[in-house]
Amino acid sequence: MSRHKSKKLIIEDDEPKQDELNPFSFKEFIRNKNQPSCSTEATEVYNGACLVEQDYNTSIDFATKGPFFTDPSALCQPPESEPDETWIESHQRSAIEGSPDFELCGASDISAYSEQSSLCSDEREAAEWELGQSDFLPKKHLSRISTGSYEGDEETSVIDISFHHKRGNAENGTKNLQQLREENSLLRKQVKELVRMSETDSRRIKQLTDEMHNKKLQEEKEANDLEAMVQSVEQNLQLMTKRAVKAENNISKLKQEMLKLQGQLEDYKSENERLRLGETAALATMRHNAQVASEYLNKAAQDAEISINSC
């Protein structure tokens, strides 16, 4: 932030008597302002030339713990650390807003930056309390009455210009402080938002990590189950192979036995056929013998009947 440097009225010490005699000198103005008999809205007339209206709010200085009247010149003089803090905050803000890929590096950097911002805001608030701008600014301006003394009018006008310039600088300082507060609050909001986004991303990353770990465990379990199944299938295949070999051996043995049985069956068939043929011949012979015997018996019976009849 740019600071307007107040113009200071330099009074030479070569003419002390002229300053003491001149009621419009800056020293006389400061001396009369710091007198304890000053009251609110008190009007003093110096030689009928200048009308000065004083209306200053008395307050307590937190550094000296006593009542005092604030010198307006102190209002336009910012603390020595304030320009550095202003430059640091403006530089940080420009660095943050200028980089589109700004990301939160870590919770430690964010906490350090937030602590630095809070310290800067506390120092500015302390400087504001020490300055007491809201309580020590004059409520009424100096009004000048035109006189015939050219020197007094010129010096009074210089005092008015210096006072108005200092007051403008004080107002600019107030505006700059207000702008710095707004920038600080905006930066805090951005930091809080980034912290919130970081926490959300951390929770999401943790959730995805847990899901990936669970999926890995499930895949390992499925792989182990599949491996066990493959091993059992291999064992079953080996058993089936052994059984198939054994069955082939049994089949070969059965084939040999079947061939033997077929040979025996052929033998039995031929023997049965032979026996059947021999049986048929015996039956035919027996039938022929029986027929011959029956013929002999018939002939003997006829001969016996004839002999019986002849007797």
Curated annotation (Swiss-Prot):
It comes from Danio rerio. The keyword Coiled coil applies. It is found in: Cytoplasm; Early endosome; Endosome; Recycling endosome. GO terms for biological process: cell division; cell projection organization; positive regulation of cilium assembly; positive regulation of protein localization to cilium; regulation of cytokinesis. This is Endosome-associated-trafficking regulator 1. GO terms for cellular component: centrosome; ciliary basal body; early endosome; midbody; recycling endosome. Residues 167-278 form a coiled coil. Endosome-associated protein that plays a role in membrane receptor sorting, cytokinesis and ciliogenesis. The keyword Coiled coil applies. Keywords: Cell cycle, Cell division, Cell projection, Cilium biogenesis/degradation, Coiled coil, Cytoplasm, Cytoskeleton, Endosome. Its main location: cytoplasm. Belongs to the ENTR1 family. InterPro entries: ENTR1 (IPR026757).
